[in-house]
Amino acid sequence: MSQPKRWDVPKPLATAEARMADGSRIVLRRHGNPRGPRLVISHCNGFAADAYYPFWSLLTDRFDVVLFDLRNHGWNPVGSGEDHHVGTFVEDHATIGRAIDRNFSDKPKIGVFHSVSAQSALIHASRESAYSALVLFDPVVCPPGCRPEDVEKVDKVLGQLGQAALKRRERFASLEEFMERVLRSPGFQLLCPGAPELIARATLRPASNGDGYELCCPREYEARVSLEGPRWARAADLSRVSCPVKIVGSDPTVPFSFLPTVDLREILALDYDFVPDTTHLLQLEQPAECVAAMMPFVERCVTEAF
């Protein structure tokens, strides 16, 4: 994996703070074209939305792009771990949606989410919906109709990821030290050029003691989300979702090295495609192909909404 490219995330056009029901704060960042249709973008467990810049930078010419990091990730301050779980991620969507409308004007919002943010958005949309439509990249879901072997696989690997997160290093002497670990990891071998450095800058902050860098999301918080993941993966009720949904998966034929892909092709109720030759981190591996996979659905939703 060559790493010559450097991605520099631009300064947001505007920022705002959304305060959750328990007092947790989530920073909203606006990029792109304020007069365009609105996309709301978030990330997977332990990451941050800025790490997805190779993907969302392709959308800023036309779309009004609003980013947010899940609570206790990325730009957000770290709060209590007691409320850091998928259930609060689900509840946060409604508050975040209202804060976006209040601070950046009220217009239809298409949610574009990945992994656990996709999982939580789907569960949220089965109760109410802050979004007019959802594009979900490789959501961690095992809805009725999934193959039993997929359910068993997700249960096993989420447990392994949770245990591994508890053993993660929390501090690094430099960004380069973190990047070296990423480059050695089998799960990150398909990343696009420059992505490891971008991940480092998005998921680390200067250490509180002034010595090197530390994880933005504490490892215990990341582990909790993975360990409780199987229960929430089965909680998604696709029959009750209140808005159009497009699911874009990673390649179910590629041996997984980060998180297993659930093969949703046989669930006929879904608008489902996958991006060939990708793993769970597909938006950081083939960003242009991921945009191409979602655009016909987004265009239809924009036409209907506007």
Describe each region flagged by the PLM.
Residues 106-149:
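Conserved hydrolase catalytic core segment
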Residues 133-171:
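Flexible "cap/lid" loop of the alpha/beta hydrolase fold
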Residues 169-253:
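Alpha/beta-hydrolase
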Residues 1-42, 61-64, 101-105, 299-306:
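Alpha/beta-hydrolase fold catalytic core
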Residues 239-278:
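Conserved loop-alpha-helix segment in the C-terminal half of the alpha/beta-hydrolase fold
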Residues 21, 70-112, 116, 292:
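Active-site loop/oxyanion-hole signature of alpha/beta-hydrolase fold enzymes
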Residues 278-287, 291:
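Catalytic histidine-centered segment of alpha/beta-hydrolase-like enzymes
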Residues 29-78:
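Conserved HGGG/HGGXW glycine-rich cap/lid loop of the alpha/beta-hydrolase fold
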